[in-house]
């Protein structure tokens, strides 16, 4: 069982900065803005060759005007405390001891969890003076760190992991045993290298988790959908746009298949974005789309397909990600409104006709289970291995049905096709003058390959490669007769 470490504290004390340092990532959004982190963010860390799970949480504090959101954030933090084996109580050395710190310490004493007091932001300060007040919390030794620079982090984590590291028995080996052990270790390293090299070529998509990004405009029900699938209060859900600010990665096993769900912040028009933090959130969402295998676009049934939904779809298509479209809150609209929404989808999403559309209620769960079949179908299609002979045969059938257009009076020749990559699926076609083929014929070939290969939910890209002329850079060697004829011609021209 991998030990779990939870980072707890007031808002803006540096929990997310510390989380990023421990996980050696930039997964947690960081800014000088209280209440930026709202959901539980999970990450993997390796400390002294031992694996741990780190949980970043929203701050615990009473802020006037946002009590309801704050209540949900506090609940998320308390859930993290219950999950954790060790709690790191992060404090702000510059701000000193505040009433909220006393309340958190009181709660931690009741839970009787292994707790470490960590005073952050001690850079540029006298650590002895800065840490004195925090001993009054009666939770043991206070560790001073600077998470942004890494000062004191190694000493802290060495103390944290001590209970989880088994003591190694002292074994004295003879010289012969030492030599045998050395060569066995060398052989293991060689075998490991060979294995890693072969793994690059033998990696089976079925053995990898499906990374699923859930995207959409603010307040369309993305976090509600994640919570229903997980069957727990995992994501902060509230009827205010922008409740989710960061991209949260959540592992899940469903029907013996591994998934990694990525719950993202809502994306709206750039003109409506006022806060710098929201711009960071949008960038993280777009990066989550690029990192995903499949994207689940959530549309609000009450509002229909907006221009912002179309912009998101365009970005997903350009990124080459597989797609499943979900219309949420379907139970909240009338039958007449449902007809209008379906007509709008047919009219405005005609360019994404390869993606399946589901009508669901994330709140009540209707239609949610059917999503997994379409998600797996889209992933399987985008990672399908297709041999060269089949692709070439399909290309020839497409050519027989509809000949390529003329280019400067000459017919384009399509010679053969092969696979050029997966996720997205790329078909490379070789031939003469292929780079001059117009867009309409490219779309025809793309749709023909899609129908023939039964590709659903995944885009197909067609790339053309011009066949090289083997004689393009070579000069013909003249025969003896041609050489004599050339000399006579030159002599004749000189006499004139």
Swiss-Prot record:
Transmembrane segments: none annotated. GO terms for biological process: ribosome biogenesis. Residues 3-168, 210-383 form the EngA-type G domain. It comes from the Bacteria. Residues 384-468 form the KH-like domain. GTP 2 binds at residues 216-223, 263-267, 328-331. Coiled coil: none annotated. One of its GO terms (molecular function) is GTP binding. GTP 1 binds at residues 9-16, 56-60, 120-123. InterPro entries: G_ENGA (IPR031166), GTP-bd (IPR006073), GTPase_Der (IPR016484), KH_dom-like (IPR032859), KH_dom-like_a/b (IPR015946), P-loop_NTPase (IPR027417), Small_GTP-bd (IPR005225). Pfam families: KH_dom-like, MMR_HSR1. Keywords: GTP-binding, Nucleotide-binding, Repeat, Ribosome biogenesis. Associates with the 50S ribosomal subunit. Belongs to the TRAFAC class TrmE-Era-EngA-EngB-Septin-like GTPase superfamily. EngA (Der) GTPase family. GTPase that plays an essential role in the late steps of ribosome biogenesis. This is GTPase Der.
